[in-house]
A protein has these predicted regions:
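Nucleotide-sugar donor-binding/catalytic module of glycosyltransferases
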Residues: 1-105
Length: 105
């Protein structure tokens, strides 16, 4: 089944906030999405936290690059996306559980 939505999360040293962000995305009532986590050269445990989540959920893909900034991290995610519809969530944000269900309603 093709995913209708690609959610891109650019990350840089987000170990304090990334778990709450990921939980809010993975807890969506709408589940037909891929989750692209773009590690922008984090020097903390951000990547390890994301790898643990990726082992548990096949919708997650991790992309990594040297630290190039938010815009280039988002662009890397967009270029890797397989869906026509793209959504962005920053690594220090979280979203309502029905956000994407409402978007596709």
């Amino acid at each position: 089944m093709n995913k209708e939505l690609s959610i891109i999360v650019p990350m840089y040293n987000a170990e304090r906030t990334i778990e709450k962000c990921l939980q809010s995305i993975l807890g969506q009532t709408y589940s037909n999405f891929e989750l692209l986590l773009v590690n922008d050269g984090s020097e903390d445990k951000t990547l390890q936290i994301c790898e643990a989540y990726a082992k548990k959920d096949k919708r997650i893909r991790i992309l990594s690059q040297e630290n190039k900034g938010l815009i280039k991290a988002r662009k890397l995610g967009v270029n890797a996306a397989t869906s026509a519809v793209v959504g962005f969530v920053d690594s220090d944000d979280w979203i309502d559980a029905d956000m994407y269900e409402r978007m596709f309603a």
